[in-house]
Amino acid sequence: MTNTATTSNGKLNFLRVAALLAAIGSLISPLLATGPLSGSGPLHAMHGMVGNLNFVLALVASIGGILWGRASGNKGLMFHALSLPLLAVIQIALGQMHLTMVHIVLGFAYLLAAVALFTLALRKPRA
């Protein structure tokens, strides 16, 4: 039989790792964005691929948030994690529509949200 605290700690650790990966992805993407802004082709493709990877990482982080939210009863971090994939989908759509300035502003909002999710997950006490 599994100890509830151990299972809850595992879910929190899963959330922490997923949030860390999402934060790293969100930091890499603007570094590659200098390519599309300057008209460089290969960086433009890499920026798009990292953006799609960020969406997948945001989904994984949201799963971690759901698991932690159910185990701990704390829904705040769960809803923060659930906002990341939504922001990522909107971000991808804006990039595909070539709405550059809105894409850049929302990109920084996504970066802040991903880094904040990781730092908040680090601060959460173990259940």
Language-model features: where?
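Polytopic transmembrane helical bundles with strong interfacial aromatic enrichment
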Residues: 1-127
